[in-house]
Amino acid sequence: MDTIDTPGEQGSQSFGNSLGARFDLPRKEQDPSQALAVASYQNKTDSQVVEEHLDELISLADSCGISVLETRSWILKTPSASTYINVGKLEEIEEILKEFPSIGTLIIDEEITPSQQRNLEKRLGLVVLDRTELILEIFSSRALTAEANIQVQLAQARYLLPRLKRLWGHLSRQKSGGGSGGFVKGEGEKQIELDRRMVRERIHKLSAQLKAVIKQRAERRKVKSRRGIPTFALIGYTNSGKSTLLNLLTAADTYVEDKLFATLDPKTRKCVLPGGRHVLLTDTVGFIRKLPHTLVAAFKSTLEAAFHEDVLLHVVDASHPLALEHVQTTYDLFQELKIEKPRIITVLNKVDRLPQGSIPMKLRLLSPLPVLISAKTGEGIQNLLSLMTEIIQEKSLHVTLNFPYTEYGKFTELCDAGVVASSRYQEDFLVVEAYLPKELQKKFRPFISYVFPEDCGDDEGRGPVLESSFGD
């Protein structure tokens, strides 16, 4: 396996400073770490929403070490095919640049085409970054494991491939001292073709590495499934409080910081529910509006693995003005990955930031009905744990088992799986009450003496063992 590059200590904070070395700006006073951010919307009713979108774009830029000095938004029904931004707004941007001469970067809250990016840079004399490039850079700086690095580098390579001409255009201008900026005939075109071949080869190698990682994860999932421990995945919009909730439920020390994509690598921890039942909780990468398709494709296996857990805890920042949009972003991702929506518990987090009773009715009526919590203060956590317990019990067979003392190891196995509700010692047997998941029912069938009435339908207290009660 090839060596995987890992981000340096400075991470994406050095990205803004590195732009000066990568791009030749025409004016000395320009600083590529200072930017103008722009966003568009379809009609006047979206004007308030677009301001929230700009705030998110500013946070993305800040995570990359870029300071946004000025923002603009406007209605854009039909983008320009050549520059994305229409002529009138380009002239408005040029006036802004006169007012803020230090601005060296234009950030657009969309993914634009390579030709639009090149044409804008040539027209405005700025580095032009789209939303996708910012998100890719942040993911690159947050990736800590080999798997995450493979996924991010694969997404970056796919994004870079059609944009090599743009980078060579800047290099040729540097070599020619800024002149017309055209390619040196022959040399530049040959080098672009060589670079394209190298990038394609890198995509091929990274794809092969990712397939190997996916295979390893599938094997681990099989082992985990055979153990019969129920699994929950924490999903939701970035910065919604998933890692804080994981720490609270598992007494873990997962990295928590109030910034976008603080968690990129999935982390799994054991959680003990009321009554002693063990489950596994996995914290996953946060979603975001307009998540780049290259990233969705590269992280598809990671996202699918999360969505295929037994139950999803969909964590929503109830205090955010665009909470409903964040919910829809998650549901849209289900559709993009063509995944049927699994069992979900909607968790409205950060209710401590809201006045009592001020949670919008549209959030309260989300299906399934949400649990209100604060992962920071612990409010509502017992309600969440109780609901998790109920769901696990619904998916399990409530039974009594009789273990001869010669089979004590089987009892230990059930304890390790966290499915034992109680046990008592008798003269010839160890009598155990347990909730058996489907994965363990066939294995422990010989030891089951009773199935509880909620599972077998017998109204006479505890019922007899029924073959139809068991999984295949």
From Swiss-Prot:
GO terms for molecular function: GTP binding; GTPase activity; metal ion binding; ribosome binding. The keyword Ion transport does not apply. Residues 230-396 form the Hflx-type G domain. The keyword Nucleotide-binding applies. Keywords: Cytoplasm, GTP-binding, Magnesium, Metal-binding, Nucleotide-binding. It is found in: Cytoplasm. Changing residue 349 to Y: Loss of activity. GTP binds at residues 236-243, 261-265, 283-286, 349-352, 374-376. Residues 1-21 are annotated as: Disordered. It holds the Pfam family MMR_HSR1. CDD domains: HflX. Mg(2+) binds at residues 243, 263. Gene3D superfamilies: 6.10.250.2860, GTPase HflX, N-terminal domain, P-loop containing nucleotide triphosphate hydrolases. Monomer. Associates with the 50S ribosomal subunit. GTPase that associates with the 50S ribosomal subunit and may have a role during protein synthesis or ribosome biogenesis. Specific for GTP. Full-length protein is required for specific association with the 50S ribosomal subunit. This is GTPase HflX. It comes from Chlamydia pneumoniae (Chlamydophila pneumoniae). The gene is hflX.
